[in-house]
Amino acid sequence: MPEVPAAGLWPFLLLLAVQVSTVASSTQPWHCAPCSAEKLALCPPVPSSCPELSRPAGCGCCPMCALPLGAACGVATARYARGLSCRALPGEPRPLHALTRGQGACVPEPATPTASGLSSIEKEEAKASMVPERVPPESAEMTEEQLLESFHLMASSSEDQPILWNAISTYKSMRAREMADIKKWKQPCRRELYKVLERLAKAQQKAGEEIYKFYLPNCNKNGFYHSKQCETSLDGEAELCWCVYPWSGRRIPGSLEIRGDPNCHQYFNVQN
């Protein structure tokens, strides 16, 4: 899904909450923008003490030191070392919420003793069964976190999932089940989210279409806006974020648009 952690999944991705039904299509998924020689030249050196290099999280270009066993991890952190995966801590009541905030832990990948004798379909089913708090396809409670960051952390360290493609595929799957009738949705953020996905789905059909920056409304589970909104960047740059009113999505007057955390709670503390 092209998150976006600060440089790209940055947000991402979508992670682990939504299981998408495969949608047959001749179109190609959008991937991260290629890393130019200029961008690579700006990368800081990796410490010589680093035991294992890892691809950058999200759409970044600079190699990073892979996270070791037991290290804190999440959507916007470095990737974990080979043989590990990022999981919410045992007993965590909101696994997805914790992982999107870097509150997971690097643990050994669950063993699959009989994997060699399984078909590809059975392997995928076994993999999906390890996803905590999976949201069934019939669920209409899909936020930006679930759409954008699913399939990011739960993928093995060797996989590179096209995040935006998964978000659009999820949307198409819902439309196929006649579950995303925008006219019936009253919540403002949810309505805008599906309108944006509809536009992206249409743009994806155009041959040669390249989109490296876009905006997906960040909705809460009730269909209203999170006060912090960010663009999604697939070109390795830090995402721009800003603050909005949760009930309308309108920009808060005087709030800044910055690359990083705009600390939106400060505006509500002042007003209250």
Swiss-Prot record:
User: Gene Ontology cellular component?
Assistant: extracellular space
Question: Phosphoserine is carried by which residues?
Answer: S139, S157, S169, S255
Per UniProt, the short sequence motif Cell attachment site occupies residue numbers 259-261
Main location, first listed in the record: secreted
Endpoints of the signal sequence: 1-25
Supply the alphabetized keyword list: Disulfide bond, Growth factor binding, Phosphoprotein, Secreted, Signal
Modification Phosphothreonine occurs at: T170
Q: Biological process (GO) annotations?
A: regulation of insulin-like growth factor receptor signaling pathway
Q: What InterPro entries does this protein map onto?
A: Growth_fac_rcpt_cys_sf, IGFBP-like, IGFBP1, IGFBP_1-6_chordata, Insulin_GF-bd_Cys-rich_CS, Thyroglobulin_1, Thyroglobulin_1_sf
Q: Which cysteines does the record link by disulfide bonds?
A: C32-C59, C35-C61, C43-C62, C50-C65, C73-C86, C189-C219, C230-C241, C243-C264
- Self-association state and partner proteins as the record states: Binds equally well IGF1 and IGF2. Interacts with integrin ITGA5:ITGB1. Interacts with VHL; this interaction inhibits HIF1A degradation.
Its biological purpose is as follows: Multifunctional protein that plays a critical role in regulating the availability of IGFs such as IGF1 and IGF2 to their receptors and thereby regulates IGF-mediated cellular processes including cell migration, proliferation, differentiation or apoptosis in a cell-type specific manner. Also plays a positive role in cell migration by interacting with integrin ITGA5:ITGB1 through its RGD motif. Mechanistically, binding to integrins leads to activation of focal adhesion kinase/PTK2 and stimulation of the mitogen-activated protein kinase (MAPK) pathway.
Please report the name of this protein according to its UniProt entry. Answer: Insulin-like growth factor-binding protein 1
